[in-house]
Swiss-Prot record:
This protein is synthesized as a Gag-Pol-vMyc-Env chimeric protein. The sequence shown here corresponds to the Myc homolog fragment of the chimera. Residues 331-383 form the bHLH domain. This is Viral myc transforming protein. Its main location: host cell. GO terms for molecular function: DNA binding; DNA-binding transcription factor activity; protein dimerization activity. Residues 390-411 are annotated as: Leucine-zipper. InterPro entries: bHLH_dom, HLH_DNA-bd_sf, Myc-LZ, Myc_transcription_factors, Tscrpt_reg_Myc, Tscrpt_reg_Myc_N. Transforms avian and murine macrophages and fibroblasts as well as murine B-lymphoid cells. It comes from Avian retrovirus OK10. Residues 144-174, 203-267 are annotated as: Disordered. Keywords: DNA-binding, Host nucleus, Oncogene. Residues 156-169 have a biased composition (Pro residues).
Amino acid sequence: MPLSASLPSKNYDYDYDSVQPYFYFEEEEENFYLAAQQRGSELQPPAPSEDIWKKFELLPAPPLSPSRRSSLAAASCFPSTADQLEMVTELLGGDMVNQSFICDPDDESFVKSIIIQDCMWSGFSAAAKLEKVVSEKLATYQASRREGGPAAASRPGPPPSGPPPPPAGPAASAGLYLHDLGAAAADCIDPSVVFPYPLSERAPRAAPPGANPAALLGVDTPPTTSSDSEEEQEEDEEIDVVTLAEANESESSTESSTEASEEHCKPHHSPLVLKRCHVNIHQHNYAAPPSTKVEYPAAKRLKLDSGRVLKQISNNRKCSSPRTSDSEENDKRRMHNVLERQRRNELKLSFFALRDQIPEVANNEKAPKVVILKKATEYVLSIQSDEHRLIAEKEQLRRRREQLKHKLEQLRNSRA
C-alpha cells in the first residue's frame, strides 16, 4: 500500500471508518479477547487476520512494537524515511497489537494464551522480508546519524519522560527516531513472561558499556536456505517467533515476589537484538502409565487378589513341570501307536480268516481285501439262498411225515 506525503494529520492513528471493512466484531459469547479489549467503556476491534497481510502484501510488524506517536507527531510536515517506516510499523499493527492483544502486560496468563495461539504471532513467510527491510532501514538511519546528528544519537541513559522538542532537520529527526526506539524498548514485554522456557540456545552479544542501545540494534538472521524454508513450513513441530530482547543492561530486577521458576528461566539483559527463536512444542504422552494409583473397593480388591493368586499358581504349575507334561504327551502318543498297531493286526487276521471261509479265495493268499469282501458277500448270499431252500424242503418233509403218520394210523385201525 503506497504511503502519500500529503497526509491530512500528523497523528498516524487512522480513522476507524476508513479501515472499517478490514475489521470485524465477533459475537459477545464468542469474543475471546473481550476482557483484554475492554478498557472502561471502550471496545477495541481485533487486529486483521493473516489473510489481510497476504492480500495487500504487507510486511508483518515484529511483536511488542511500542507506540512512538509522540515523536512522530512532532516531526516535520513532510514525512522523512524514519517517519515512513514508523507509519508502516503502526499501519502493520504496532499500536493495534499493543491495544488489542497486549492490553495488560502484567497479566502473564493472558499474554501466553493470546500471543502463542494467535495466527499473527505464529510466524510465516513474510518474517524474512520484515527482517531484511528493518536491516536496510537501520543501516540507513545509522549512516544518517553519523553524518548529521552524532551528538543527539550518542546520548546514553534512559529517555526523558516528557515528549522531546521537535527536531530541526531530517538528520535530527532520524536521530530522534533512534532515541525513541531505544526508549520504547524498555516498555516491551519480557519474552520470559510469554515463553517460560529458553527461546534460543545461542547467547546474545554483549553490549559495550556506555553505548546507545538504539545504535546496537542488529538483525540476527540466518541465510535463507532450503533447510530454513522447510523449517518454516513445518509449523507442527516448530513455531517461528520474532522477539525483541531488552536493551538496558545496567537495569537490574529488584522484585523478590516472583516465583523461583520465572527467576530461573528469565534471560540476562542483552542489547536490543531482533532475532528469530525456535520454540519446541511439547506434547503430552497419552501412552504413559497413570501416575496416581487407582483405589478399588474391598470386595473387588479381594477378588482381584484371588484371581492373581490363582493365575500365579497355574503359571507356577505350568512352569515347574514342563518336562512332566512332555513325558505324558510322549506316553500317550506311544500308547496310541501300540493300540493302532494291534487294531491293524487284528483286522488283518480277520481278513485272513474270512478268506479261509470263502472257497473261491481260500487258496489265494495274495487276494486283496476288496476281493475278499466281495466274494464274502456273494458267498453269504448263496448261503442264505441255500438256507431258504433247505427250510422249504424241511417243511415239505415235515408235511410228508405227517401224511405218512396219518396213513399208518388208518391202516392199523383197519386191521383191528
